Amino acid sequence: MIGPINPKTNNGHRFILVAIDYFTKWVEAGSFAHVTQKVVKKFIERDLICRYGPPEKIITDNAQNFNGKMIIELCAKWKIKHSNSSPYRPKMNGAVEAANKNVKKIIQKMVVTYKDWHEMLPFSLHAYRTAVRTSTGATPYTLVYGMEAVMPLEVEIPSLRDRKSVV
């Protein structure tokens, strides 16, 4: 989780809830005004389970909103193993900390005013997902979808991929 972020957005959002797949480095994230158990449960169901199926395991920090009754019941329902990262040692969960840092940096470079950062979050995620990760030697997009992403710039300027298929 990233936040609280100041200033809060036009719609009152102050937090970014982040999930990362350890193998592909794929990141899912959403912005929220508050991060309660109900918000975390909805995020896991809507943004993770409904898109990719239930994960085998999730690792969260030790905050109550990630470890309460609703989350325990969710994990039991979907047969998800739930464990916690080491308390007071964020470096032990390095992949998440690195992803959080990178997402924050990308958002900071994209925002026009700091109150619109929530509108830049999808674009920031796209930039993160289509950048090569040194740990895998590939982009998260390629590892998840098995193909290269079509970049927004390629819509305006035809890429070599397009030219090869025409010739």
Question: Residue spans of the language-model regions?
Answer:
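Integrase module of LTR retroelements
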Residues: 1-167
